[in-house]
Amino acid sequence: MAWTSAAASMAAAQHDLTTAVFSGGGKQTAEQGRFNILLMGGDAGQDRVGLRPDSMTVASVDTKTGRTVLISLPRNLQSAPFPSSSPLHDRFPHGFRCSDGSCMLNAIYTYASEHRDLYPGVRNPGAQATKEAVEGATGLQINYWVLIDLKGFETLVDSVGGVTMDVYRRVPIGGGSTKIHGYVQAGKNRHLNGYEALWFARSRADSSDYDRMVRQKCVMRAMLKQLDPITVLTKFNKIAAASKEVVATDIPPSEIATMMDLALKAKALPVSSAAMVPPLIHPGAPDYGLIRSTVQKIITKSENIDNRTAEPTPATAPDATPKPKPTASPSRSTQTDDLSKVCAA
């Protein structure tokens, strides 16, 4: 009878999860063989009016192989363009800009939430408008969005038993408006609880926004590699309870199985990464043509990995030149074909 009770409990948790988290925005068709999903980390701190996504990353996933490219946009990106189909296009025909410089990419969420009349019938206008701006900036069709409230991220990580990952530099806990009261210590294969993982991902002390974007990608990669079917099944009720509090998305329930299948494929492959940050892109005066061409180049490069034929390469003598050992710099690049190299301690 125990297994019957457990199955019933899991079924009830699954029903609650799909009702609370998956808003059913409608099934989308993959664009050119890819699903493009906007991942947003939201933070409604005490010093803020409304929620603003502090991190915005597009996960572009090949529907056949699961091979994934993570494309990050800085929260302070100015003049984000809206596609002509967006309700905000007529209001901001030259991009999201204002005279005081406060019209950054992460402010679009709040603006649209305060102007819900522009999005009649849309459950989350802020997320929808941000998705549209990211489409305009990257040139990608964004199929779905996922919003994670950073306040509850700690609970979500704890629900799966923590996360094991390399911590490539010591990261302060606290800082800014509060006193630094500890550190996430550097080291290989550190097992972090939810509290430590949250601060590793969000800490701004002694680092830049761009380094924070790197750390957030490293946490994403570690979670992806760790979440196997056994973990999900054995801890489903805890995951479901935590997810209801911290995750919202417009992925319809009918697509959950498809997304899980892609995640399982993706975890077996290296993750490519690109960030639209200096020196390539300057957030105050971004070149959106350059952003779009860069996005296409890294996606094409990722696809070519699987399209190459297995041809023998001529043998070359090993290079005896000593190579400098990389240092744990506070600022790491995420322009890479394999994110694990960037995240390594």
Report each predicted region and the residues it spans.
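Non-catalytic, solvent-exposed segments at the cell envelope interface
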Residues: A2-A345
